């Protein structure tokens, strides 16, 4: 059995070698010759999986180690009798922590408290729900918009997108990319929406680049609209609008979900799905794969305020470490993908063990996802 895996999927070689011969290949572009005798293909979001790639090939299963699936033609795979699995929710925690790192940086720079802001969350799936929970644990008001879930009658106080635009100080997008249909998200943030945002609002896109109309956004920024922008995703990736990058406050190369834990979850989820597909079901405990974190433990004295939270968050991950490298190489062919391929190891908040002498601080940090304990001061 021959299994092709994206060379940037951590732990893929070790795990899939339990099931057969493993060949690591680049994800963009996939070397088509390798598909001629392969049984399975494991990809990330950079690989377009469709009829033109796989027609006439012996591939029996495709796995994507990503939550999103808009790079995969699922209908064609089903028609062709090819098994498929994604990794829903694998990087949701990472994306939430990316948003927090960005917001805490902007709050410190611009001198505001997040408690004084209302956050509108567009898309309330794996990422949106977790973001809502952490924001509300901090006492920050949220507004939710998710028409598909609202129409299904899912639990939640869902509001219209127009209401979020009118009321939210921060608008953050966490939707799939639907190019048509009743829940179309292509250019969901169009010129009309962008112009309607509150003065001084913060716009965040960490889902799919085309959810925000990049040309319209640049037009509004060039005309002097008072707007802070955080973009992790771009229309036309791996190409991007370099002028737009110079105008946004934070710009990163589609790495919001790139924690080691998130990548490992993606790999293990598709590994488990494929092992079940071939009748050799196996389960993997994530903590058996991950290395010890860089920071063992720290001690926190007193209550948890916003400056202290910012220091803890940025100790684990400061979004500026990914903003600066992109600005240096933007516009140079191939560099966007190189930044992703050679991405520095990044951990999640749970990797940081925090000893608190304040019980409420320990409790709150645990709700936020840190590994915190209460040890009273002596």
From Swiss-Prot:
Q: Which residues bind substrate?
A: 45, 66, 258
Q: Which family does it belong to?
A: Belongs to the D-isomer specific 2-hydroxyacid dehydrogenase family. PdxB subfamily.
Associated pathway: Cofactor biosynthesis; pyridoxine 5'-phosphate biosynthesis; pyridoxine 5'-phosphate from D-erythrose 4-phosphate: step 2/5
The active site of this protein is located at 208, 237, 254 (proton donor)
Name its cellular compartments.
Cytoplasm
Source organism, top-level taxon: Bacteria
What is the protein name given in its UniProt record?
Erythronate-4-phosphate dehydrogenase
Q: Which gene encodes it?
A: pdxB
Q: Which HAMAP family match?
A: PdxB
Q: Report the PANTHER family cross-referenced here.
A: FORMATE DEHYDROGENASE 1 (PTHR42938:SF9)
- Subunit organization: Homodimer.
Source organism of this protein record: Shigella flexneri
Q: What is one Gene Ontology biological process annotated in the Swiss-Prot or TrEMBL record?
A: 'de novo' pyridoxal 5'-phosphate biosynthetic process
| Sequence positions that bind NAD(+) | 146, 175, 232, 257
- A Pfam family recorded for this sequence: 2-Hacid_dh_C
Segment forming the signal sequence: none
Which keywords describe this protein according to UniProt?
Cytoplasm, NAD, Oxidoreductase, Pyridoxine biosynthesis
As its record notes, the protein acts as a catalyst of: 4-phospho-D-erythronate + NAD(+) = (R)-3-hydroxy-2-oxo-4-phosphooxybutanoate + NADH + H(+)
Q: What does this protein do?
A: Catalyzes the oxidation of erythronate-4-phosphate to 3-hydroxy-2-oxo-4-phosphonooxybutanoate.
* InterPro entries cross-referenced by the UniProt entry: D-isomer_2_OHA_DH_cat_dom, D-isomer_DH_CS, D-isomer_DH_CS1, D-isomer_DH_NAD-bd, Erythronate-4-P_DHase, Erythronate-4-P_DHase_dimer, NAD(P)-bd_dom_sf, PdxB_dimer_sf
């Amino acid at each position: 059995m021959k299994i092709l895996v994206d060379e940037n999927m951590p732990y893929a070689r070790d795990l899939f070698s339990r099931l057969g011969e493993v060949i690591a290949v680049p994800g963009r572009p996939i070397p088509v010759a390798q598909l001629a005798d392969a049984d399975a293909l494991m990809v990330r979001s950079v690989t377009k999986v469709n009829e033109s790639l796989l027609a006439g090939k012996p591939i029996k299963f495709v796995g994507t180690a990503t939550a999103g699936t808009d790079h995969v033609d699922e209908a064609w795979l089903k028609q062709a009798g090819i098994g498929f699995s994604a990794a829903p929710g694998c990087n949701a925690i990472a994306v939430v922590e990316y948003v927090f790192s960005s917001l805490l940086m902007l709050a410190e720079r611009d001198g505001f408290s997040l408690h004084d802001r209302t956050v509108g969350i567009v898309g309330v799936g794996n990422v949106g729900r977790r973001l809502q929970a952490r924001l509300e644990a901090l006492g920050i008001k949220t507004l939710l918009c998710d028409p598909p879930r609202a129409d299904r009658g899912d639990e939640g106080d869902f509001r219209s997108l127009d209401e979020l635009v009118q009321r939210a100080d921060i608008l953050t997008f966490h939707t799939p990319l639907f190019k048509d249909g009743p829940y179309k998200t292509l250019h969901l943030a169009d010129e009309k929406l962008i112009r309607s945002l509150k003065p001084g609002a913060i716009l965040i896109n960490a889902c799919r680049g085309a959810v925000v109309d990049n040309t319209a956004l640049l037009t509004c920024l060039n005309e002097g609209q008072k707007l802070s922008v955080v973009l992790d995703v771009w229309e036309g990736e791996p190409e991007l609008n370099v002028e737009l990058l110079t105008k946004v406050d934070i710009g990163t190369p589609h790495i919001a979900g790139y924690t080691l834990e998130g990548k490992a979850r993606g790999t293990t989820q598709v590994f488990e799905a494929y092992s079940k597909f071939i009748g050799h079901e196996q389960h993997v405990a994530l903590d058996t794969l991950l290395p010890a974190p860089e920071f063992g433990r720290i001690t926190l004295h007193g209550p948890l305020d916003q400056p202290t939270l910012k220091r803890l968050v940025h100790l684990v991950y400061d979004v500026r470490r990914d903003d600066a490298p992109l600005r240096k190489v933007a516009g140079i062919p191939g560099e966007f993908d190189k930044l992703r391929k050679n991405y520095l190891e990044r951990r999640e908040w749970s990797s940081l063990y925090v000893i608190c002498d304040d019980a409420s601080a320990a409790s709150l940090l645990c709700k936020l996802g840190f590994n915190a304990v209460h040890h009273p001061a002596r």
